């Protein structure tokens, strides 16, 4: 009968509405206010995340990060006040604590541009879209440490660039000769003997770019060919 069908639909609608209301009541009203910063790494094969951050701090300073951290503290106080007034205090308190992520307050999103095409009136047109490839999360403490270190060197370059310059300065003529004698003027890969020093290179076993230091234990003799092959890897 029509009455029974109408009742059936009313019951279904009622159940759906109750479900929506229950979901609305019990879902978390808290969303952590992350600060997102986007880096375009198109054309960069293996960008160093800390270098990206250093460049950003050199150009923009640290104030926006400090301001956002202050904003997060204000947001927390407002959330705590709402929890105290809520009839679901225990649930809201749990939801609030679960969303707190101060250690990942700042999100650095690395993007690459991709070329795509669409056809309009049989003519192909290209356009670019930015595709996120990686997201890095950090806190104000990490950013402050890097900012302070950059400040000490006058913001003249990234910390890795400064470190590399410092390590290269440590490669003195005396140290070169000491390593050459230690390795008997012999390439440590192919065994070529170079007593006259022609084609002899002093190589960092762990490259400076990867944190290697200019110390005896990290240096070796290589011939020009082997050194070139190693650099190309």
State where each predicted segment sits.
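N-terminal topogenic membrane-targeting module
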Residues: 25-140
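Helix N-cap and loop-to-helix transition residues
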Residues: 139-142, 172, 207, 215, ...
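Short, charged surface segments at domain edges that flank catalytic/cofactor-binding sites
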Residues: 141-189
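Catalytic core segments in nucleotide and nucleic-acid processing enzymes
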Residues: 184, 228, 232
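Histidine-centered nuclease catalytic patch
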Residues: 192-221, 232-233
